[in-house]
Structures are given as structure tokens and as C-alpha cells.
Amino acid sequence: RAKALLKNVEVFGVPNLCVLNEDPVGIASRFSGFFDKVLIDAPCSGEGMFRKDNKLIKAWEKNGPEFYSQIQRNIILAGADMLKPGGKLLYSTCTFSKLEDEDSVIHLLTNRPDMHLIDIKPYEGFSHGFDTDEGYHLEKAVRIFPHKMPGEGHFVALFEKDGEDYTSSKRPVSGKTKLPDELKEFMDSTTFEYDPAYINIRDTRVFLTSPYMAEERGLRIIRNGLLLGELKKNRFEPSQAFAMALTKDQFNNCLDLPVSDDRVIR
């Protein structure tokens, strides 16, 4: 899944990325109070997807809400710990299970008193979260039922962390980085903004790493930064990830082709 995630964010054109294959608690220990926003698409029993894929029913019989509940609770606490003061965390599942939905919300609010629920923009067909056995009223959480709006079954809750936001400091770099001529020539042909100090060349591959994300030892990192391309025989060949991150306006020379043009397919 981590490699599929990497492919998706690269095709989407995300320039500032770090993809990990790591336990959330391990990530939280390195990035406490680091992120402005955290999105949790939690692993769940998938009750909301039964209509879409009935194979999930057998998976549910093997590993139901009780199995996933503890995993979700560990993830949501780790997510809150990685959030900056003033930051927002969105917790979502594709299950109807109260144990995995409202009970996970209460687990976070009980164990992290600096987190509170905030409103989600309403849409026609949204339903409120269920009341809990402990007497909590979760009107700000959202349930999506397939008989009330298009789609399957989902649960969403949006949290905010108390305190004032602050800007993370950039990681220090030593000295100036001299870029290979062929790389500099290509970069100069674009208006893409970057700091050469954060260019990292590994063998022939060229990466633009995040100024805020150091190379963390002990973490299973799939990709830290944007793959710009590869140095090949005195030329620089840009990657698809870099091409997707650039807009048309960032090229000094641009050729517009209609969709019907054969050269688009080739």
C-alpha cells in the first residue's frame, strides 16, 4: 500500500512529500507537534462497503470491529500527538460500527484534553454522530448512510488542537550545493521555485527534499521529497512526478496540443 500511495501522490503532483511504511507511534515519537493538518483514513471493519464488495463480509467475520478498534485508537492518539497547536485532524472510516466511530472519538477526547471537535460544513444527506453510552452528544461528527445520499457508509469527525499555531523551523544545511550543469540548465528553463541547498543526488537520481523534513534514521522511508529526475549521459531526464508537479506556466517554453492530436497519445 505504501508504494501505491507513493504512485498516487506523485501522479497527483504533490511536490512536498514523505512516504513512510512505519508504525504511527514510531512516527509520532519523531514528529511531535510537527504537522499543520493530519488526515486519518483509518483501517476499519468496512461495514459501509458490504454493498460495494460482498467479499468484505467474510473479512469482517474474521476481523470485526473489536479487532480494528484498538488499532484505530493507537492511530488517532498518535495523529493528535503529531499535530501542532491550532492544527486540525480529520478522522474517517468506512464502517457503521459505533465502537470504531464514536467510541474512537471519545477515546481521543478523553486521553487528549487539548483536542476538541469542530463543525464540518453540512451537506444535504449528512447525519449527526450517535450519542454514546457515556452521555456524549456528537452532533459535530458526521455519518453518511447510503439510503440518505449517494455513496456507501462513512463516518467523519474533525478535531482542532488547542493553542496558537507556530511556524516549524527549517532544518540546517551545510554550505552551498553546486548543481551539475545539465540539471541547472533544465531547472533554469522553468520558474519552479526551489532551494538548491535541499537538492539531494543519490547515484544518478535527483531529489528535492523538504526543508522541514530531515532524513530520519530508524524510520522506514519509502520516499523523502520529490523525485526530480535522473542524470543520464550528460543530460538530465525529468521524472513523471516532477512533470506532474509543474504547471504549464512554470515552463519558459510551452507547446499546447489539443486532446485530439495524435502526438498526445504517442
Q: Which ranges hold each PLM region?
A:
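Helix-to-beta-strand junctions that scaffold the AdoMet/dcAdoMet cofactor pocket
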Residues: 83-85
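Class I S-adenosyl-L-methionine
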Residues: 35, 88-91, 96-205
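Short secondary-structure boundary/capping segments
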Residues: 9, 54, 104-107
